[in-house]
Amino acid sequence: MEFSPPLQRATLIQRYKRFLADVITPDGRELTLHCPNTGAMTGCATPGDTVWYSTSDNTKRKYPHTWELTQSQSGAFICVNTLWANRLTKEAILNESISELSGYSSLKSEVKYGAERSRIDFMLQADSRPDCYIEVKSVTLAENEQGYFPDAVTERGQKHLRELMSVAAEGQRAVIFFAVLHSAITRFSPARHIDEKYAQLLSEAQQRGVEILAYKAELSAEGMALKKSLPVTL
């Protein structure tokens, strides 16, 4: 996936009110960007980091600029726009870049399922194969090349794991897919130190037949694509 039109560069002043960020452009203009990430964004929003942003041609938007990527002072690229996790995963499935999810003839998005009436990110179907239910999570929290999810306690994420376990128990294929959107991450684990319940449920889910996949995106200011499978340690 290529950014079109190209992203523009600025330097982060501050992120505030969760949805806003002030930046300064190379020519000295101060702008307020929309921040499409409600999470903690630990390590992704340090003042002085380089920010790459897009600009909408929708004249009705109060904040036409959207924060897409952070380039940390160590040089790592991080995708902070959480919408890209699903878009990149869909693109990779359709391109058959994810070998574990290849060979299906149909892909549906936002399908209702489960006792708790969740919406699954993707459902894959093919003749003579069980339906495949895929829940996607964006991974940006990093420490010494170790990627973690979640970056805050997530009751919603816990619910999704319970739903996937129910799917697996019914004989369907259930997959939790971690889209790693941080260029410095080389391996993945659940963030037990942040949400112990989620880590416990993830281990239980694996034991009950839920598949756990982690794929890392190649990231740059020009574009992004999910390419590489990463090791997962529970």
UniProtKB/Swiss-Prot annotation:
DNA-binding region positions on the chain: 201-220
Family: Belongs to the SfsA family.
Disulfide bonds: none
Function of the protein: Binds to DNA non-specifically. Could be a regulatory factor involved in maltose metabolism.
GO molecular function: DNA binding
Pfam family for this entry, one: SfsA
InterPro entries: SfsA, SfsA_C, SfsA_N
Domain of life: Bacteria
Gene3D superfamilies in the record: 2.40.50.580, 3.40.1350.60
Designated name of the protein: Sugar fermentation stimulation protein A
Alphabetized UniProt keyword annotations: DNA-binding
